[in-house]
Amino acid sequence: MNRSTISPVEARQQFRAGLIQPTSGWSAGFAQANLISMPQDLAYDFLLFAQRNPKPCPILEVLNAGETFGGIFGSNATEADIRTDAPQYRIYEHGELIDSPASAVDYWRDDLVSFIIGCSFTFEHPMVQAGVPVRHLEAGRNVPMYETSLACRPAGSLSGNLVVSLRMIPASQVADAVRITSRYPAVHGAPVHIGDPSLIGIDDINNPDFGDAPLSEPGDVPVFWACGVTPQAMVMSSKPPLAITHAPGHMLITDAPDLGFQVP
């Protein structure tokens, strides 16, 4: 199975059938997305949180309370279901992780408002096309992710620290990585930090908070991008009564072409 050539519809069907694996490298050319669903009475707070923190929380679409599919799935929108079509989910109650199921159907409520947020997996295909190596993708692993010491701007009852994803990039190609990813602001855009991880509160780069440990080659430099797992750090900090999210690195694959998010 060549995961890069699988259509978004086929990918969602496989995940709906129970396949659990990270989605880096899947359905090349199409945007991937983070998910967070929260009770309607917290929806405005989260919308404001995202507006105040656009690097980690670039909103692609907001669904009405109870809705389970959106326009980002294109002509296949009615076929898609955000409760089943990510490979794995996380269920939080009062900030505690209580389950990591393959389907969120059993926890779904009609008052949940869902936010679909851009994911940096979207710009990995353009990076590869330009010859910039993406180490975790090459190895079939999940991207490393870390909670930093950088506080997000709070909104209402919601607050938390920035989460970043890491890609080890050859020093000679860091400028290329910045140039390529800066053209995709809707999926986190340019890096937020390059170099010494301790400057953003990461004590051990080999022990990520989410995902797999990083892979590197001699001459690689750590490059960090804002990450859509930031809302999960916010959930753990703010402790809302219920939140449903994707599992880190296990994204919703949309029908939106990645070039649609590229700016000049």
Curated annotation (Swiss-Prot):
Enzyme class: lyase
Source taxon at top rank: Bacteria
InterPro entries: D-Glu_cyclase, Putative_hydro-lyase, UPF0317
Keyword Transferase annotated: no
UniProt keywords, alphabetically: Lyase
Gene Ontology molecular function terms on file: lyase activity
EC number(s) reported in the record: 4.2.1.-
Family per similarity comment: Belongs to the D-glutamate cyclase family.
The protein's name: Putative hydro-lyase cgR_2449
